Amino acid sequence: MRVITHIILFLFAALFSSAQEKIYFNSSNPFSFKDIITNPNLQTNQTVYGVLTMPDDFDSTLVYPLIIAFAGSNGWSTHHYEYLELYQSNGIATFEVSSFKSRGVSSTVGSQVDVTTAMMVLDAYKAFEVLSLHKNIDKDKIGITGWSLGGGVTLFSAWGPLKNAINPDVHFVAHLAFYPPCIVVPTILDFGEAPIHILIGELDNWTPSDACLELVNQMPINSNISLTIYPNAHHSFDRDAPPQIKSNGYILEDCRFSMNEEGAVVMNFFNIPMVTPFLQKLGVGMCAKRGPTYGGNKEVKQKALEFSKEFMKQNLLN
């Protein structure tokens, strides 16, 4: 009986190890998009890891579509995993990127300088390059998703000048951004041909929905970007906890910035590029307040889960 038990445990462990694995890859630490576009070889090297999870019906002889996923400024939470599990149950592999833990950071709420959007976008492409070689991943069916800060990563991973600077041969086939910060508008509005969709709450004062609507409305008429604004929904509308105040977070409703072709976000007041932590804090501090509201709306959460499933099935499974 003991031998049989050991065999069962061994087989279970082998199955689990084949369906989920921790993967390391090389990235770096650019502070801004400008660092990637103009100084790609001057950045410090950084080892980053993530967890690759295969679909529930995993067969080691097959290849699967993949979603590379990024959490927000508070790191990974329960509601994020609900989406990943939903994708896995529908035949899609997921890769949970640990951009924060890889750099020894637990949260960037209220600062956004220890781990930046630029670092995470670079992580996304470096992860793509490695995972596209995996024997069970379909390199032509890789999408990206993220929440809040990770939503910004998802959105700007499609920005042409940045993508071309990192790897013009790598193409995400779908971008699903949850409540991203849309407060930066590039002078070059090139976001590629792959479908981009933004899900955001009407009442979001952390990453305001008005900014996303403004960005989408400025896009060229042939852009493949769309937007859903959920009524009566705050930031992190897909959390289970009710709305509450995040005292050290930023209220960004009054903040709008432009970004030049080199990837430098410009302080609108003085036309100064915010390419250092000090300048970024100064620029944001001049327009932002503290204490945004975040928390769940059960009805909206269910709508977002259903939309996410159908969006990814349409773009990764068809």
Predicted regions and their residues:
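N-terminal cap/lid segment of alpha/beta-hydrolase-fold proteins
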Residues: 19-62
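Short beta-strand element of the alpha/beta-hydrolase
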Residues: 61-72
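Cap/lid segment of the alpha/beta-hydrolase catalytic domain
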Residues: 73-89, 99-119, 157-162, 286-290
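Short alpha-helix in the alpha/beta-hydrolase fold that links the catalytic acid
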Residues: 82, 207-218, 242
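Alpha/beta-hydrolase active-site loop
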Residues: 113-135, 156
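Alpha/beta-hydrolase fold nucleophile elbow
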Residues: 137-148
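Short beta-strand/loop motif that positions the catalytic acidic residue
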Residues: 192, 198-200
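C-terminal catalytic histidine-bearing segment of alpha/beta-hydrolase fold enzymes
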Residues: 224-318
